[in-house]
């Protein structure tokens, strides 16, 4: 494998300031990439991450704030990313909303939020980024979910949005080839959700019992798969890679 093949290349990571997004950023930066980290409300986390990375490599991280629900802002996010370093080699559509919307209680606002962050924003960001990625023969990595085709109760809108991400990934892979590769990662249980989607200890045990490896994954499992798709997978296009400890092979 060629060493430092990513040095000087540029990745835009949405929702890159915390949780899995921060680990993706950490992994790509360690491989020599310059980063544009998008955030909406995690300003302090974003600036802390930038400071951490730039101790090792000054002027290697730019930050861009934006609301992914506002489609008119999305081309500007991409343009800021390109302006920061003069090129764009990878778009990682990581940002996501996740919470229950049981039938009978779901609202139009929840629909707009879940579809907007998980499906609409990745498409319009990809559309804006495509001309720049074609110039560099770059790639797009979307974040799907193993529940895109194995829906979980009480999450119909989220599951529908992620199902859309799967087909969007395959469609973009055809639309943007041969210059741009488009793939997706479908996480299983990686980090326990926060806030409204938080699960009980009993629910955690029930979920773990269905995973052949009998444990959760880590953010590094997702980040290393994304690194593989960006750096090494030059002949992989239109694929969705499950990172789930074997959950999808269990009935």
Tell me the role of every PLM-derived stretch.
Residues 2, 150, 210, 227, ...:
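Short C-terminal tail/terminal secondary-structure segment
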Residues 10, 17-19:
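Conserved glycine-rich cofactor-binding loop
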Residues 102-103, 107-115, 196, 203, ...:
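Substrate-binding pocket helix/loop in short-chain dehydrogenase/reductase
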Residues 126, 161, 169:
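Active-site helix of classical SDR
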Residues 131, 173-178:
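Alpha-helical segment proximal to the catalytic Tyr-Lys
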Residues 177-181, 236-238:
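Short, small/polar-rich loop/turn modules that mediate ligand/substrate recognition or access, typified
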Residues 211-222:
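A conserved structural motif in NAD(P)-dependent oxidoreductases
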